[in-house]
Regions:
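Active-site beta-loop-alpha junctions of metal-dependent nucleic acid enzymes
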Residues: 26-54, 229-234
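Single conserved hydrophobic/aromatic residue that forms the stacking wall/gate
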Residues: 1-11
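Active-site-proximal acidic segments at structured loop/helix or strand boundaries
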Residues: 108-207
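RNase H-like two-metal-ion nuclease catalytic core shared by retroviral integrases
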Residues: 57-58, 69-70, 88-112, 126-130
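Two-metal-ion acidic nuclease core segments, chiefly of the RNase H-like superfamily
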Residues: 71-90
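Short conserved beta-strand segments at catalytic cores or DNA/RNA-binding microdomains
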Residues: 12-22, 56, 82, 208
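Protein C-terminal end segments and domain termini
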Residues: 213-367
Length: 367
């Protein structure tokens, strides 16, 4: 297995080669870190549907913490746990000797020439890696020089000698702990990630995956963010700060966590109407509408806001009611007490004694 990158690349490639069949697996990552190494293994094993009994590695510092004088390797903690989970025998090439694993070194060049020229463009890492997997599948149809079978046919013999996948995959994440600051931020590496303001000054645990950072307090997950690979950045989730802004309404427009928060235009219309009708209380109700995002999806809340605007029901109670009706799949029925200017209808209850008249009429007709 090999990791490769070039000065012009904005990604890191991880390449796994099965030398007997020449089958390969290639995956791209934004950075060369231990969790990316392990995540690449997990996806490779899922791709082949089996686990190799042994793998030859580079002496990458993400995997090898130290090379001892007798040549044995002291593994990094995450990598050691991964090997124990899959029962893989790890072997290593000599430092600086790429020819110890010449097959995979040649495969890196093949992937660069055939998969990356011209350089493909994708909107997400997931789309990029799905495309790379498809290229690896197509390559299994090739017949290499000197061989009488396709790579895919030879791969079947490799798979017969490999181990079955375990019941559950390894959790490929870097684990850390931290403490929430007074600004409701948690530092991981060089960046700060927000958590709900209710958890200020509390100890938390952190699980950093390749593409996500998950933060929890005791047994509860309290925040999840896309992982930032830049340095000294603040990563906010505006929803985390809404309870505080509900109490400090004057700070709403200047709050840093809300800067750049793009909401559908109907939300701005709702806020304008609320503030025009209810002044300061209207702004508070608008924040309460936004706080519904703590529980519900933006798509559902957006639909409820649009429906409220169409009905002229401008208020938090109306939006919440319409949202609940949408989620519970029942027709909306607004509480008209909130709208005294609407016309009312009154339906009297029938008294049981009224039905006796029908019985007496039937008796007279029978006579």
């Amino acid at each position: 297995l090999d990791r490769s990158s070039a000065a012009s690349d904005v990604y890191k490639r991880q390449v796994l080669d099965l030398p007997h069949s020449d089958a390969c697996y290639v995956r791209a990552y934004p950075a060369a870190v231990a969790e990316a190494w392990v995540d690449g293994h997990i996806h490779a094993f899922a791709f082949f549907g089996a686990v190799p009994q042994s793998i030859v590695y580079d002496n990458d510092r993400c995997l090898v913490a130290k090379i001892l004088p007798d040549g044995t390797r002291k593994r990094a903690a995450l990598f050691s746990g991964f090997l124990s989970h899959y029962l893989i025998r790890d072997r290593y090439g000599r430092p600086g000797k790429g020819n110890d694993k010449g097959n995979v070194e040649g495969l890196v060049g093949y992937c660069r020439r055939n998969f990356m020229v011209p350089l493909p463009e994708f909107a997400t890492w997931e789309a990029f890696n799905l495309w790379l997997e498809e290229q690896c599948r197509k390559r299994q149809q090739d017949v290499l020089r000197g061989e009488g079978e396709t790579i895919g046919e030879r791969l079947q013999r490799d798979l017969a000698e490999m181990r079955s996948l375990p019941a559950s995959p390894f959790d490929a994440c870097d684990q850390d702990t931290g403490r929430v600051s007074s600004q409701s931020l948690v530092r991981y590496k060089t960046n700060d990630y927000s958590v709900p303001v209710a958890f200020a000054h509390q100890d938390v645990w952190i699980r950093a995956y390749v593409h996500d950072v998950v933060i929890g307090c005791r047994g509860e997950v309290i925040a999840r963010h896309p992982r930032c690979w830049d340095r000294d950045e603040l990563i906010f989730n505006p929803i985390h700060y809404l309870p505080l802004l509900e109490q400090k309404l004057n700070a709403f427009d200047q709050a840093a966590p809300l800067q750049g928060w793009e909401l559908p235009e109907e939300f701005a219309t709702l806020r304008r109407l609320m503030e025009a009708r209810m002044n300061r209380h209207g702004r508070r109700e608008y924040v309460q509408v936004l706080r519904l995002l703590e529980t519900f999806d933006l798509a559902d809340l957006h639909a409820a806001v649009k429906q409220a605007l169409q009905m002229g029901a401008i208020g938090f109670d109306a939006v919440k009611h319409l949202l609940l009706c949408r989620v519970e799949h029942r027709p909306p029925r607004l509480d008209l007490d909130c709208y005294p200017y609407l016309p009312r209808t009154t339906v009297d209850k029938t008294r049981p004694g009224s039905y006796m008249r029908l019985l007496s009429s039937d008796a007279e007709d029978a006579a």
